């Protein structure tokens, strides 16, 4: 975990499911950065140097991904629910002494951040979500176009070991295909970062845990989301999304988040899905402005 983020601390933070390796650097407002699928904490390696002169960054892997703990799965997929993943993050921040903090999440990390803001509203000062609309909205609006573009939601949520077996036959091919399909044009993927993603994603337990993440999203996460869907989040919300991605084409992103939050701002940035790597300069400027640091 030490190949990226020069000058950052590498911490081993205890939680109720085990120790999480965490990178920490910078000064000022504590900001928790959460990665998505099929990546790791490494996704923030370009944007971190633009942010850390102004804020303190705390960058873990999500449970099941990278070097994070990988608890056993269960039939109800509770172990990989966003509620449990959010609890991990709350425990990490408590262990590090941060009772109030901002959180920014990309892809699956944005969904964990959304649940964190729901379940720990008094602790989250600002929420940034990158290239997603709310999970419940996306499932409820499913049609042929969505199912085609987001087929992985329905593939990965199939009963084990079907997706695990198929991905495990050539995880590097699957990983590269996803990164290329979801991104915009241009050279954005650093080869060193790609090799880190490949090393993590090639592990059988990571493949299984990431499938469990999506199984939870299609089952228990929807139960949790429907239970509190009528309560709007009150902290400031920022939505950032790639101009050329499916989310930009499919949704009025600000309006989608206004359905679940009282105060929403945001904008599109260059590129496709992988906002922190495809548009680090634009995204960093918007995030710092949102946090009142610019």
Predicted regions and their residues:
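Flexible "cap/lid" subdomain of the alpha/beta-hydrolase fold that forms the substrate-access gate
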Residues: 2-11, 17-22, 30, 43, ...
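Short beta-strand element of the alpha/beta-hydrolase
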Residues: 29-35
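The serine-hydrolase catalytic nucleophile loop
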Residues: 37-48
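Proline-centered flexible-loop/turn and helix-kink motifs
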Residues: 38, 53, 121-122, 262, ...
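A short, Lys/Arg-enriched amphipathic alpha-helix followed by its capping loop at the start of a domain
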Residues: 46-55, 95
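Catalytic histidine-centered segment of alpha/beta-hydrolase-like enzymes
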Residues: 272-284
